[in-house]
Structures are given as structure tokens and as C-alpha cells.
């Protein structure tokens, strides 16, 4: 009897957490706009982020964090994000149209 109540409570809470995650993802992704353009649509020499596969972006950000991928700025920026934040950022940009 207890398990169904826990499942029901979790089902009710799920919709409440999605908007908060969307807001957090959008806020984190906004920090990328200075170099990579609004919503990741770069107009200059920077790589566009909009539409990039989530797994690819997670991999690249982790490579910046570890120093496996050379960079001038990104290695420092990537170190400031948690795994959860990287996942949110990657999901946000993957959902954007190119």
C-alpha cells in the first residue's frame, strides 16, 4: 500500500520539476551567448551549439574540463560546471534548431 502512494507522489511532482529544470538550463546556456550567439546560433568564428547532439556536447565539455581538448577559455569555464549542469546545458542546446 505504501509503494503506490510513493509512486503517485512522484508522478505528481514530476511536472513541477520540469519547468524549474528548463529555467535552470536556459540560465546556464545564456552564459554561452557572448561567444556562441543567442541560443547557440553562432554568427562568427565560434562553433555553433544549437542542434548539437547532447552526447557530443557533454563529451566536448568534459574534454575541456580535463584538459584533453585544448582551449583558451573553455577549459576554465567548463571546470565551473557540475556534471548535472553540463547535462542541462547540453540538453538545452540539443533542443535548439540550428
PLM region descriptions:
Residues 66-69, 79-98:
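C-terminal capping alpha-helices of c-type cytochrome domains
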Residues 13-17:
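N-terminal signal peptide c-region/cleavage motif recognized by signal peptidases
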Amino acid at each position: 500500500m505504501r509503494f503506490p502512494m510513493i509512486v503517485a507522489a512522484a508522478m505528481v511532482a514530476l511536472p513541477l520539476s520540469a519547468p524549474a529544470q528548463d529555467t535552470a538550463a536556459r540560465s546556464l546556456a545564456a552564459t554561452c551567448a557572448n561567444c556562441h550567439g543567442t541560443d547557440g546560433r553562432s554568427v562568427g568564428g565560434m562553433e555553433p551549439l544549437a542542434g548539437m547532439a547532447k552526447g557530443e556536447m557533454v563529451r566536448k565539455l568534459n574534454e575541456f574540463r580535463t584538459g584533453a581538448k585544448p582551449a583558451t577559455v573553455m577549459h576554465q569555464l567548463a571546470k565551473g560546471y557540475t556534471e548535472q549542469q553540463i547535462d542541462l546545458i547540453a540538453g538545452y542546446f540539443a533542443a535548439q534548431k540550428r
